[in-house]
Amino acid sequence: MSSYALYRGTTLGQALDKTLEDMESEGLLTKSLASKVLQQFDKSMNKQISRLPKEKMNFCATQLLTYRYCDNVWTFILNNVTLKDPQRSFDEPIDKLKVVACDGRQTSLLQTLSAQGPSKRVNRAHAAAAGDDEDDDSD
């Protein structure tokens, strides 16, 4: 079963990654075991997030800076965003907001991966490893 690696860029994900790198450099952990830990982190985060209550939040942005749709994942970068939520109040607008939306149904993810075939998955993996994603640092 595949999981999206969206949450590795969060504070928690970055701290885990840094800790695993430190443990690897000290010889306490192998690279393959660190990779398994990150894969389990991805699965666990996706599972826990799906259990959260589904609350609606409204937002309004003055500008849609960029958008992208790739592999059933939408990514939007918005400028000057005002959030409205029935339970909370937000006093000031957010300068920049990145929204990543993906299909949470695992069957569609697996169908997409199998439809791409192994060569496309490998090419995308090489592109991602080469730093082809320009929006990763805009969180």
Swiss-Prot record:
InterPro entries: TFIIA_a-hlx, TFIIA_b-brl, TFIIA_gsu, TFIIA_gsu_C, TFIIA_gsu_N. It comes from the Eukaryota. The keyword Transcription applies. It is found in: Nucleus. Its main location: nucleus. It holds the Pfam family TFIIA_gamma_C. The keyword Nucleus applies. Residues 113-139 are annotated as: Disordered. One of its GO terms (biological process) is RNA polymerase II preinitiation complex assembly. GO terms for cellular component: transcription factor TFIIA complex. One of its GO terms (molecular function) is RNA polymerase II general transcription initiation factor activity. Belongs to the TFIIA subunit 2 family. This is Transcription initiation factor IIA small chain homolog. It comes from Caenorhabditis elegans.
